[in-house]
Regions:
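Membrane-embedded alpha-helical bundles that constitute the cytochrome b-like, heme-associated redox core
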Residues: 1-215
């Protein structure tokens, strides 16, 4: 398998893990922690496959598109590191030896806030990379239909994002997650997938706007 294929498979699997982790109300705490630690190792593998970015981040041509993507990548990395740190400090099963590194109440507030920021930046990150794929797509009826469908899905996704109170989590207005723990896992994952798609589509639109602005 080529390195490019490995990267693509890793990206897809990471998106799946993120959706699964954000569906924590439908999983027990122990599976959530184990999946989180597994996701940490997958992210490390992802970083190894993309070491070139760290080596060339300062050398890459300084244009608005690359600068914006670098900002999103940096924000994504920072929010991920802080999400992991706060999560591990609350762990009871996966890494109990790290439990209590910081005050549990503080860790909970940080984790609730930062995981949602990470979710948003992950979506934007996906959207910027989707622009490269879109350049290979022909302006056909299927492509036009997909674009319209993406708008409709995204509008619904943002309504879900607001309806579930995720903005309050991002602004650290609440200390506890108010979730429906009776919702089936598949339904929770579909909801989170739609919301992630919405942010990815926004990332795609921003990237496309910057690209057209340059030309």
């Amino acid at each position: 398998m080529s390195k490019k294929s490995q990267k693509q498979l890793t990206d897809i699997f990471l998106a799946f893990l993120l959706i699964l982790l954000m569906s924590s109300q439908s999983t027990e705490q122990k599976p959530h922690e184990v999946i989180g630690v597994f996701a940490l190792f997958m992210v490390l593998a992802h970083q190894i496959l993309n070491l070139w970015w760290y080596k060339n981040a300062l050398k890459i041509q300084k244009n608005p598109l690359n600068l914006t993507l670098n900002f999103i990548n940096l924000a994504l990395i920072i929010s991920f590191i802080l999400s992991v740190f706060s999560g591990l400090s609350m762990s009871k099963y996966a890494t109990p030896f790290l439990n209590g590194i910081i005050k549990i109440s503080t860790a909970r507030e940080f984790h609730l806030c930062l995981t949602h920021w990470f979710f948003v930046f992950a979506g934007l990150h996906i959207g910027f990379h989707a622009l490269k794929l879109a350049t290979y797509a022909n302006k056909s009826k299927i492509a036009n239909f997909a674009f319209v469908a993406s708008w409709l899905i995204s509008i619904y996704g943002f309504w879900l994002f607001l309806d579930t109170g995720m903005v309050d989590y991002m602004l650290a207005k609440v200390q506890f997650a108010f979730l429906d723990f009776k919702i089936p896992l598949y339904q929770s994952m579909i909801i989170n997938a739609i919301m992630l798609f919405s942010w990815a589509f926004i990332g795609f639109l921003i990237a496309n706007f910057i690209k057209n602005l340059r030309s």
